[in-house]
Curated annotation (Swiss-Prot):
GO terms for molecular function: cis-regulatory region sequence-specific DNA binding; DNA-binding transcription factor activity; protein dimerization activity. It is found in: Nucleus. This is Transcription factor bHLH130. It comes from Arabidopsis thaliana. One of its GO terms (biological process) is regulation of nitrogen utilization. Its main location: nucleus. It holds the Pfam family HLH. GO terms for cellular component: cytoplasm; nucleus. PANTHER family: TRANSCRIPTION FACTOR BHLH130 (PTHR16223:SF351), TRANSCRIPTION FACTOR BHLH83-RELATED (PTHR16223). The gene is BHLH130. Residues 285-335 form the bHLH domain.
Length: 359
C-alpha cells in the first residue's frame, strides 16, 4: 500500500513524469471519470475461486449474490471500524505515463474484502491454500513483467475485465487496454546500468606476456614520437604541417612507425638476453652467448687432455683431471732434467779422432 500511495501522489515532485503531460487531457479525464473501467474485485475474486475448483459456498455462483446484510454482526462491526480507503483525485493520474497501469476503486476495496474473509474463517468451510494465495494477488499477475524497463503490462487482468465488460463501454475499455498493454515508448524506458562492468581496461593480461608487452611499448613509443612532432610543429608555426601530422596521428601507422616497432622489438630481445635465466637450461641446449663460450672452452680443454694422454704414459689410468695434470707436469720436468744431462755430457765429451787430426 505504501508503494501504491507513492505512485498515486497527487503532487509529484520528480521531473521525470512531467514529460508525460503531453497526452490529451480529454483521454485521461475519460478514463478517470468512467467508473465502469475500474476492476470489480468481487467479480475478479469469484472468477479465480471458480477456476481453481474450490468447494463450498465460496466456489459457488451464489458468492456474488450474497449481500452484506447476511454477514455476522462481528464482521459488520469490524468492517465499520476499518478506515475508509483513500479517495483518489482525477488529477493524480495526470502525472503518470499512458502505458502505466491504473488502479480503480474495486482494487482498493479488495483489501477490505480480504480482511472481511479472514474474520469469517470460522463461519465458512475450510478452503484450499490456492485461495489464500490468490486472495492477495492473482497467480499470473507478475508473469508479464518487462525485463527491460521494469513496467508491468497487466495483460491478464485486462483480459478478465474485458470479458466482463458490457458492450456500451467496450470502446473505452479497449482503448484503455491498448494503452496499458502497449510497450513503453522510448521516453519511458529506463537506462540499464550494469552492476558489474567487465574489467577489460588493462593494456595487457599479465606482466610476463611478451607479445602484449611489446605492443604496449610500441604504442607508447609511437604516441611519444607523434606528440613530439606535433609540439615542434606548433613552435615553428607551420599550420599545414601541423594538420598533416594530426591526420597522421589519427590514422593507421605507416612505414616509419613499423620501423620503430621493429627497433623496439630488437631492444626488447636484447633486454631478454641481458636478463639471467630463472630456470637452468640443460647442457647443450643453452643459447646464451656466455653459455656458448663456456661450452667451447670445455670442449677445447677436453681435446687437449686427450693429446696429453697420448704423450704421457700411464695418464689414462687417472680419473681426476687435476691428477692427470700433475702427472703431466712431473713427466715434463723429468724430460727437462734428462735433456740437461745429455747436453752436459755432450759438452764434456772429447773425441780421439778429432785430436789426432789437429796434431
Amino acid at each position: 500500500m505504501d508503494s501504491n500511495n507513492h505512485l498515486y501522489d497527487p503532487n509529484p515532485t520528480g521531473s521525470g513524469l512531467l514529460r508525460f503531460r503531453s497526452a490529451p487531457s480529454s483521454v485521461l479525464a475519460a478514463f478517470v471519470d468512467d467508473d465502469k473501467i475500474g476492476f470489480d474485485s468481487d467479480r475478479l475474486l469469484s472468477r479465480f475461486v471458480t477456476s481453481n475448483g474450490v468447494n463450498g459456498d465460496l466456489g459457488s455462483p451464489k458468492f456474488e449474490d450474497k449481500s452484506p446484510v447476511s454477514l455476522t454482526n462481528t464482521s459488520v462491526s469490524y468492517a465499520a471500524t476499518l478506515p475508509p480507503p483513500p479517495q483518489l483525485e482525477p488529477s493524480s493520474f495526470l502525472g503518470l505515463p499512458p502505458h502505466y497501469p491504473r488502479q480503480s476503486k474495486g482494487i482498493m476495496n479488495s483489501v477490505g474484502l480480504d480482511q472481511f474473509l479472514g474474520i469469517n474463517n470460522h463461519h465458512t468451510k475450510p478452503v484450499e491454500s490456492n485461495l489464500l494465495r490468490q486472495s492477495s494477488s492473482p497467480a499470473g499477475m507478475f508473469t508479464n513483467l518487462s525485463d527491460q524497463n521494469g513496467y508491468g503490462s497487466m495483460r491478464n487482468l485486462m483480459n478478465y475485465e474485458e470479458d466482463e465488460e458490457s458492450p456500451s463501454n467496450s470502446n473505452g475499455l479497449r482503448r484503455h487496454c491498448s494503452l496499458s498493454s502497449r510497450p513503453p515508448s522510448s521516453l519511458g524506458m529506463l537506462s540499464q546500468i550494469p552492476e558489474i562492468a567487465p574489467e577489460t581496461n588493462f593494456p595487457y593480461s599479465h606482466w610476463n606476456d611478451p607479445s602484449s608487452f611489446i605492443d604496449n611499448l610500441s604504442s607508447l613509443k609511437r604516441e611519444a614520437e607523434d606528440d613530439g612532432k606535433l609540439f615542434l610543429g606548433a613552435q615553428n608555426g607551420e599550420s599545414g604541417n601541423r594538420m598533416q601530422l594530426l591526420s597522421h596521428h589519427l590514422s593507421l601507422p605507416k612505414s616509419s612507425s613499423t620501423a620503430s616497432d621493429m627497433v623496439s622489438v630488437d631492444k626488447y630481445l636484447q633486454l631478454q638476453d641481458s636478463v639471467p635465466c630463472k630456470i637452468r637450461a640443460k647442457r647443450g641446449c643453452a643459447t646464451h652467448p656466455r653459455s656458448i663460450a663456456e661450452r667451447v672452452r670445455r670442449t677445447r680443454i677436453s681435446e687437449r687432455m686427450r693429446k696429453l694422454q697420448e704423450l704421457v704414459p700411464n695418464m689414462d689410468k687417472q680419473t681426476n683431471t687435476s691428477d692427470m695434470l700433475d702427472l703431466a707436469v712431473d713427466y715434463i720436468k723429468d724430460l727437462q732434467r734428462q735433456y740437461k744431462i745429455l747436453n752436459d755430457n755432450r759438452a764434456n765429451c772429447k773425441c780421439m779422432n778429432k785430436e789426432k787430426k789437429s796434431i
